[in-house]
Amino acid sequence: LGPDSVPLSRSVLGLPPRSCLICGENAKACARNRTHSMELVRWRTAQILNDYFKEQSADQAAAAAVRALLYEVSATPKPGLVDRNNSGSHQDMDFFTFVDSSSALIPWFRDFFSIGWEHGDETGDRLFERLRFAGQNAEAKMFSATGGVNTHKGLIFASAILCGALGKVYKDAFLLGKKPPVPLDAVVGECKKLGSCSLKDFKAEDRRQDVSAGAGRRRSTEETAGERIHTAYGIAGARG
């Protein structure tokens, strides 16, 4: 209202007409002419709310994840490990290498959460593959930030599963109208489902080993350290 109690229009204030949420045109004209159906208006409203709460929750998840990384490397002393005082047995990295890596991973923690939110209704295998692909891109950013040093590869794997599971559970709670925090057992249950998908890698590797052995070929040099340990000792490592 103005000093004379007369409502002030947007044009008087030098502002453009309010945009329609559906088409972007003049909202008043769309409302007056009933340009859009009520079903479309409700759908768009739900989409706006979904996007808002997804982005807000993804930011919170990413902040918590990077805070955990910084707390871990800051814990001192940690004999044999990187801390604020020394590099322990890791001569190719130091405290600041971890800080650089942690900073580079922030957007990927958001991405993991968003993947779980947006694709939580897919099968566990398909959701896991989406998270794996994003995790591989996150690894590339980590190596770029650290000059080729592996500071958080295992953590990326674990956080992709955790943040992805968290995103799925948050979306389910949002659809039911439930407020955070979400049940811990629900998040742990989703982590277990996604983690079990990764164990299929070992089964595929075992089959490759059998074929190679039968053909008299040597084992592939492209195995990861985890795959080599599994082949030698049957230990599942991060996947288990």
Per-range role (PLM):
Residues 2-9, 13-54:
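Long, contiguous binding/interaction regions
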Residues 4-8, 29-32, 157-158, 165-167, ...:
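Short, well-ordered, mixed-charge alpha-helical segments that flank or form enzyme active sites
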Residues 13-17, 39, 136, 149, ...:
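Short, amphipathic alpha-helical segments
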Residues 24, 139, 195-196:
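Histidine-centered, metal-coordinating catalytic motifs and their short helical/loop contexts
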Residues 27-30, 87, 121, 143-145:
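Glycine- and acidic
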Residues 47-121, 128, 166-240:
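Phosphate-rich cofactor/ligand-interacting catalytic cores and adjacent structured alpha/beta frameworks
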Residues 110-168:
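Long, hydrophobic/aromatic-enriched structural stretches that serve as scaffold segments
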